[in-house]
């Protein structure tokens, strides 16, 4: 009979002790995100959270997302500090468009070989994103899967649950009307979409993103600028300003052409005034370097616009003043119009706002 060496889990590539070390590293950052509704801490089989008592007819709103191939850039450039903010932003910004207050967030971190420093850095970013959004990081899953990923590679996914009063649910399909004004909220940059095309352009440019400067800032800084989280600004707008928000669109994958129609009723379209804003320099660089036509830019990227709010024209000035007062860059970008066809929902024009 042949003697066999006694194997253990670590021999197979899974270091349980590293997982324990990671939990200890992140406990403080996680606890700082907790809301009064959170019951208990890390370590249970399931996270517990009560509904805020202020809601009479609470509607739960959930969302899940990732950060796409922006993660590939972060890994290649060894910049792990802010990708977690992106992960939270992609989820909570989808909730706020329906008027929902994010309650809690969970993350999924999968890797070929767990590097405690890298994972702790990423999760610290997730905790920072949760603090920006006012939601609690209540748990997650760290999966070490040798053979599934290259050793230092990792993947991320996030899940968020929020709540909105039934009477305050924002439903564009029911509320948007021809004549509504569209307000834009500036993005912080590319956010977390279009990065497969971004990486192609970067390869074509042959630029070193760490050393090549664009308007006084490294290309790497532009490309990895964290996604802006709009939750607190929009929630405060809803709760304090008595404005009748008809719809909010989050400009993510698919840009203008895919996201704005998601909140439009039938027989409506939107007119966008291109001259109402100037693209941030990173979008100009991408278009020029990649020889990308303007329609493709609008279909792939946010081009400097993170959110679009539809509301009655007589409430536009008040809303703009408030958004500016809470630190948002906002402006009139267009209006809703009637349409007899469903084929052309987004129309770009040089000038429409004074017509």
From Swiss-Prot:
SUPFAM superfamilies: PurM C-terminal domain-like, PurM N-terminal domain-like. Its EC number is 6.3.3.1. It is found in: Cytoplasm. Pathway: Purine metabolism; IMP biosynthesis via de novo pathway; 5-amino-1-(5-phospho-D-ribosyl)imidazole from N(2)-formyl-N(1)-(5-phospho-D-ribosyl)glycinamide: step 2/2. Keywords: ATP-binding, Cytoplasm, Ligase, Nucleotide-binding, Purine biosynthesis. Pfam families: AIRS (PF00586), AIRS_C (PF02769). It catalyses: 2-formamido-N(1)-(5-O-phospho-beta-D-ribosyl)acetamidine + ATP = 5-amino-1-(5-phospho-beta-D-ribosyl)imidazole + ADP + phosphate + H(+). GO terms for biological process: 'de novo' IMP biosynthetic process; adenine biosynthetic process. Its main location: cytoplasm. GO terms for molecular function: ATP binding; phosphoribosylamine-glycine ligase activity; phosphoribosylformylglycinamidine cyclo-ligase activity. GO terms for cellular component: cytosol. Belongs to the AIR synthase family. This is Phosphoribosylformylglycinamidine cyclo-ligase. It comes from Hamiltonella defensa subsp. Acyrthosiphon pisum (strain 5AT).
């Amino acid at each position: 009979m042949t003697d066999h060496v006694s194997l253990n889990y670590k021999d197979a590539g899974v270091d349980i002790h590293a997982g324990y070390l990671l939990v200890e590293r992140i406990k403080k950052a996680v606890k700082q995100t907790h809301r009064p509704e959170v019951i208990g801490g890390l370590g249970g089989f399931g996270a517990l959270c009560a509904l805020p008592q202020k809601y009479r007819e609470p509607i739960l709103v959930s969302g899940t997302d990732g950060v796409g191939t922006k993660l590939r850039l972060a890994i290649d450039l060894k910049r792990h500090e802010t990708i977690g903010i992106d992960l939270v932003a992609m989820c909570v910004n989808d909730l706020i468009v329906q008027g929902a207050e994010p309650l809690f967030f969970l993350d999924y971190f999968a890797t070929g070989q767990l590097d405690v420093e890298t994972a702790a850095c990423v999760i610290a970013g997730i905790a920072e994103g949760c603090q920006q959004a006012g939601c609690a990081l209540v748990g997650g899953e760290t999966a070490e899967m040798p053979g599934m990923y290259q050793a230092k590679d990792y993947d991320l996914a996030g899940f968020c649950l929020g709540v909105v009063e039934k009477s305050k649910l924002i439903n564009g399909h029911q509320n948007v009307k021809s004549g509504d004004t569209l307000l834009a909220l500036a993005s912080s940059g590319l956010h977390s979409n279009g990065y497969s095309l971004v990486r192609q352009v970067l390869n074509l440019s042959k630029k070193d993103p760490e050393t090549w400067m664009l308007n006084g800032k490294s290309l790497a800084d532009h490309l990895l600028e964290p996604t802006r989280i709009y939750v607190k600004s929009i929630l405060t707008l809803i709760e304090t300003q008595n404005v009748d928000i008809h719809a909010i669109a989050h400009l993510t994958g698919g840009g203008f052409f895919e996201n704005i129609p998601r909140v439009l009723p039938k027989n409506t379209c939107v007119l966008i005034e291109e001259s109402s804003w100037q693209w941030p320099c990173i979008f100009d660089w991408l278009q020029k370097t990649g020889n990308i036509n303007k329609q493709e830019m609008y279909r792939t990227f946010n081009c400097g616009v993170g959110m679009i709010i539809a509301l009655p024209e007589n409430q536009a000035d008040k809303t703009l003043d408030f958004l500016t007062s809470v630190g948002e860059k906002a402006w009139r970008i267009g209006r809703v119009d009637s349409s007899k066809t469903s084929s052309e929902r987004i129309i770009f024009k040089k000038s429409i706002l004074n017509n």
